[in-house]
C-alpha cells in the first residue's frame, strides 16, 4: 500500500469510525432514532431524494446563490482591499466601517435583505455578498500592505507609474493573503446560504432541511444536512488544489 493511500486512510479514519458509531448507536437503541436515525436509513432517504429530483432542484438553486454571492464578494472585496492598502484616504474613510461590521454576526442581516429584496434569489445573493466580502477585503488589504518596499522602490526607480506598480508588485504580493481570505469566505458562504434559506426561502437546501424537519421526516432531513456538509467539503478540497497551483505558479 502506497504512502499516499495510508495517509488518506489515517486522515479519514475518524469519519469512518464516526459513521460506524452512528449506525451502531441508533440500531442498538443507545440513541433515539427520532433524534438520530440510523445512517443506513439516512442513506436510503438520500437516494430517494435524488430519484425524486428534490436534491438536484434545490441543490442547484443553492449553488447558484452561493456562487453568485461569492463571486461578487471576491471581485469587489479584492479590489476594495487593495485600494484601501494603496490609497491612504480610502483607507481612512472605509476602515471604520470594516472594523464595525466585521465582528457583527452576518446572519443578523437576513431580515434586512429579505425586507429589501424579498424571499427570492436576490436577497440570498446580497446576504452572501455582504458577509463574504469582508474576509476577502481584509485578506487583500493585509496582503497588499505586506508588499516588500524594496520591490516597490525598484519598480518606481525603473519609471513604473502608480498603476503599473499596483498591478506588477502589490497585487502579486497580496495573492497569498487574498487566497486565504477567499477560503474563509467560501466556508462562510455555505453558512449564510443555509441560514438564510432556513428562514426566508421557498427553495434551496436550507429550505428543504427546514421543511423536512417540520414534517418529521428526520431521515431525509439528515440526508440533506450531510449533503450540505459534503458540498462544503468538496468545494474546500477543490479550492485548496487551485490555491496551491496558483501559489506555485506565482513562485
Residue ranges of predicted features:
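Cytoplasmic-entry segments and transmembrane alpha-helices of multi-pass inner-membrane transporters
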Residues: 4, 75, 79-114, 138-142, ...
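Loop-to-helix entry region at the N-terminal start of transmembrane alpha-helices
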Residues: 57-65, 115-136, 174, 179, ...
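Glycine-rich helix-loop "coupling/hinge" segments at transmembrane-helix boundaries
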Residues: 114-116, 144, 191-228, 247-251
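Short cytoplasmic-facing helical segments at TM-TM junctions of multi-pass membrane proteins
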Residues: 139, 143-184, 205, 209
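Transmembrane alpha-helical segments of polytopic membrane transport and secretion proteins
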Residues: 1-16, 237-251
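Transmembrane alpha-helices
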Residues: 126, 130, 162-196, 222, ...
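Periplasmic/extracellular loop-to-transmembrane helix junction in inner-membrane transport proteins
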Residues: 2-4, 28-74
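C-terminal transmembrane helix and the adjacent membrane-cytosol boundary/short C-terminal tail
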Residues: 88, 145, 176-180, 222-251
